Amino acid sequence: MDLWPGAWMLLLLLFLLLLFLLPTLWFCSPSAKYFFKMAFYNGWILFLAVLAIPVCAVRGRNVENMKILRLMLLHIKYLYGIRVEVRGAHHFPPSQPYVVVSNHQSSLDLLGMMEVLPGRCVPIAKRELLWAGSAGLACWLAGVIFIDRKRTGDAISVMSEVAQTLLTQDVRVWVFPEGTRNHNGSMLPFKRGAFHLAVQAQVPIVPIVMSSYQDFYCKKERRFTSGQCQVRVLPPVPTEGLTPDDVPALADRVRHSMLTVFREISTDGRGGGDYLKKPGGGG
């Protein structure tokens, strides 16, 4: 059905209004810029996943597909003007399985992870990610390990299987032991699953600390600008000879060392680090 002339004029006016409003909001409203940037960030990842799926599908579900995802995601930091500095990469054990533990601040953690991700390393993620459209399918093809955190028995069973996989397939896993994104500019208490996994498999733990994003990103303040982030790889922590009884002390010791480094690298060159006292940075 043909539109009457007035409707065409109305559509044209709405189009012109959008052309005017969007740039105005972009330059005049930090909150609008925040929402635009986050929408593009998530949408772009979903689009890249669509491109990655047919390439990864050639191998099927395979940890080597993580190299493809990493290659496709590395450029995102340039789109947002974020400089990622990596220090301590020589601490990665060269030829053995291990468990990476890292602090968890925001969905932007993906940028730091892709920058430093070692070979044959896959994250352990919450099962909900599996249903995140193209991103979920791409992650499944890349060997990401999904855990239903609400079903403790299933999670323990999966961790036992992962321990065997570490040893038999020379795989490394990346775990966020806080269990959820942290909004308070510090570190939440660590859940012990990653440490039980490392002790069960008798493999080292490699702590990785990402500095605070508060100088360029804050969900609570609706602020997202350009900036820099430091990713620090700490020396591996051996677990040989440890038993499940040693896990609580091990988790506390690793968290303490990571928190010390987090405070150090989050205040270095950032005006004394007052923003570390502000809650609400995650997202």
Curated annotation (Swiss-Prot):
What does this protein do, in the record's words? Converts 1-acyl-sn-glycerol-3-phosphate (lysophosphatidic acid or LPA) into 1,2-diacyl-sn-glycerol-3-phosphate (phosphatidic acid or PA) by incorporating an acyl moiety at the sn-2 position of the glycerol backbone.
What the record says about family reads:
Belongs to the 1-acyl-sn-glycerol-3-phosphate acyltransferase family.
Arranged from A to Z, the UniProt key words for this protein are: Acyltransferase, Endoplasmic reticulum, Lipid biosynthesis, Lipid metabolism, Membrane, Phospholipid biosynthesis, Phospholipid metabolism, Signal, Transferase, Transmembrane, Transmembrane helix
**Entry's SMART domains?**
PlsC (SM00563)
Where is it localised? Endoplasmic reticulum membrane
Q: Which reaction does it catalyse?
A: a 1-acyl-sn-glycero-3-phosphate + an acyl-CoA = a 1,2-diacyl-sn-glycero-3-phosphate + CoA; 1-(9Z-octadecenoyl)-sn-glycero-3-phosphate + (9Z)-octadecenoyl-CoA = 1,2-di-(9Z-octadecenoyl)-sn-glycero-3-phosphate + CoA; 1-(9Z-octadecenoyl)-sn-glycero-3-phosphate + hexadecanoyl-CoA = 1-(9Z)-octadecenoyl-2-hexadecanoyl-sn-glycero-3-phosphate + CoA; heptadecanoyl-CoA + 1-(9Z-octadecenoyl)-sn-glycero-3-phosphate = 1-(9Z)-octadecenoyl-2-heptadecanoyl-sn-glycero-3-phosphate + CoA
Please provide the record's free-text comment about the domains of this protein. The HXXXXD motif is essential for acyltransferase activity and may constitute the binding site for the phosphate moiety of the glycerol-3-phosphate.
Where would I look for the motif EGTR motif in this sequence? 178-181
Q: What's its membrane topology?
A: Multi-pass membrane protein
Q: Where are the Cytoplasmic topological domains?
A: 59-127
Note one Pfam family from the annotation. Acyltransferase
Task: Topology check: give the Lumenal ranges.
Answer: 27-37, 149-283
Note the InterPro entries from the entry. Answer: AGP_acyltrans (IPR004552), Plipid/glycerol_acylTrfase (IPR002123)
Q: Name one GO molecular function term.
A: 1-acylglycerol-3-phosphate O-acyltransferase activity
EC number(s) on record? 2.3.1.51
Tissue-specificity statement: Widely expressed. Expressed in adipose tissue and at high levels in testis and pancreas. Expressed at lower levels in tissues such as heart, brain, placenta, kidney, lung, spleen, thymus, prostate, ovary, intestine, colon, leukocyte and liver.
Q: Where is this motif: HXXXXD motif?
A: 104-109
Q: Which organism is it from?
A: Homo sapiens (Human)
Q: Which GO terms describe its biological process?
A: CDP-diacylglycerol biosynthetic process; phosphatidic acid biosynthetic process; phospholipid metabolic process; positive regulation of cytokine production; positive regulation of cytokine-mediated signaling pathway
Specify the protein name: 1-acyl-sn-glycerol-3-phosphate acyltransferase alpha
Signal peptide bounds = 1-26
- Under which pathway is this protein filed? Phospholipid metabolism; CDP-diacylglycerol biosynthesis; CDP-diacylglycerol from sn-glycerol 3-phosphate: step 2/3
Q: Which GO terms describe its cellular component?
A: endoplasmic reticulum; endoplasmic reticulum membrane; membrane
- Keyword Endoplasmic reticulum on entry: yes
According to the record, the segments passing through the membrane are: 38-58, 128-148
